[in-house]
Design a protein with these regions (language model features):
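Short loop/turn microsegments at loop-to-beta-strand junctions
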Residues: 130, 290-291
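Alpha-helical coiled-coil
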Residues: 2-19, 23, 292
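Amphipathic alpha-helical coiled-coil/heptad-repeat segments
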Residues: 1-10, 36-43, 47-269, 273-280, ...
Length: 320
């Protein structure tokens, strides 16, 4: 039935065109932003998950920065420790050369040893990066580098860290008061064993005692007997071994940091891919849909135009 008051065909065509325009707007939005889910209204669950994952990735980026800073500190400590090892080895050669020497020659040798001792302190003092020094400390015994971030099943944040046993690698400790808590180079070591011992005491030149203690930092060959100098040599040997262990520990930490940095980088990439799977638009698909919807839009306009012409056709009937 034809009517001049109601045009069902035009209404149907208008509804179809409106639906096409809405779909076209959605596709154009996806193409312009690159997101299939750009707002919570698009898909609340996916948007929430993606937002949380993006936030986690920002935290992981901060963790990556922390690892980079830690790596720089470790590099600084390792470089300084290597230099210190070279200096202590030089001291060892000088102590060995002092055996059997006259006091005049011992004084000359001691002048060189003292220069190395001063350089050792300077090396340890300058092992500083961003205000942190693990070789020359003032009471610091432990430190840590933030190395990991995750969430548990309840959503609570969990942080992981790489612990630094500063006590095991420090060369000097200004706050230490006993031989066993002092740094590797300054704590007195028993001349008989080379081990740091709280019962060790300063030796008397020329007289060997069971409690004689020596430290690389304060070593002095002038006035001491050959037997005492041999004990000094034992102390320097054990000190070198301890420093080598410390350098090995530093190197192991550096390797852990490098591994964790690589893992964190891969984890961030994985999260980015996961977010993309949830919210990114498939541009090939959207491009195809855009073309189809544009055709539908043109057809809808033509259909609406034809439907609107029905009233004109009714008028022509009366004109006949």
């Amino acid at each position: 039935m034809s009517s001049i008051n109601t045009n069902p065909s035009a209404m149907t065509a208008l509804q179809a065109l409106a639906a096409t325009n809405r779909n076209l707007a959605v596709v154009q939005q996806r193409i312009s932003t690159g997101f299939r889910v750009g707002e919570a209204k698009d898909n609340a669950a996916y948007w929430s998950i993606a937002t949380t994952m993006r936030s986690d990735n920002k935290i992981l980026s901060t963790v990556q920065d922390s690892l980079g800073l830690g790596a720089s500190r470790i590099d600084t400590a390792y470089t300084s420790m290597e230099n210190a090892l070279t200096l202590v080895d030089e001291i060892k050669q000088k102590v060995l050369a002092a055996i059997g020497m006259s006091e005049d020659n011992k004084e000359k040798i001691q002048a060189e040893i003292s220069a190395y001792q001063s350089q050792l302190r300077s090396t340890a003092r300058t092992a500083n990066f961003s205000g942190v020094n693990w070789l020359y400390v003032d009471g610091l015994s432990q430190d840590k580098i933030i190395s990991a971030f995750t969430r548990d099943q309840t959503g609570a944040i969990l942080l992981g860290s790489i612990d630094i046993d500063v006590d095991a690698i420090k060369l000097y400790d200004e706050a230490a008061t006993t031989n066993t808590t002092m740094g590797i180079l300054e704590g007195l070591r028993l001349g008989t064993t080379g081990e740091r011992n709280n019962s060790a005491t300063d030796p008397t030149p020329g007289t060997v005692a069971a409690t004689d203690g020596y430290a690389v930092d304060t070593l002095d060959v002038v006035g001491f007997s050959d037997d005492q100098i041999r004990q000094m040599l034992t102390v320097v040997d054990i000190t070198l071994a301890e420093m080598t262990e410390a350098a090995t520990a530093i190197g192991a930490i550096k390797r852990r940091i490098d591994i964790q940095k690589e893992y964190t980088s891969k984890l961030m990439d994985s999260i980015d891919r996961g977010v993309g799977q949830l919210v990114d638009a498939d541009m090939n698909r959207e491009s195809t849909r855009l073309q189809a919807l544009q055709v539908q839009q043109q057809l809808g306009i033509q259909s609406l135009s034809i439907a609107n012409s029905n009233a004109q056709n009714i008028l022509l009937l009366f004109q006949g």
